[in-house]
């Protein structure tokens, strides 16, 4: 994912977001990295690698991940979520879309928060950002 925080968000809050994202990426069950987006159009980026789609779905619905979304999304202006798979079976792509859709269906408050973003792109983009 890549994102940019709203310019009016105080530096102390940005620092807390960075600390939380860094801690989350270091304690998850995936190989992950969080940091500044170098050379891109965003401030921050994170990449995670999972051995299975089940692990990925569990992370997406983990209470700590959901709490970070609920705290962070109101502070973000632009967000891009992307999924990369090394399996070229179209069914895998469909399953990833379904993982996101199940998450949005189970947590409609996230859709409301995503609707407040100026820009959102990603798998199964919900609400006003749906394509």
Predicted stretch roles:
Residues 63-65:
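N-terminal soluble domains immediately following signal/targeting peptides that reside
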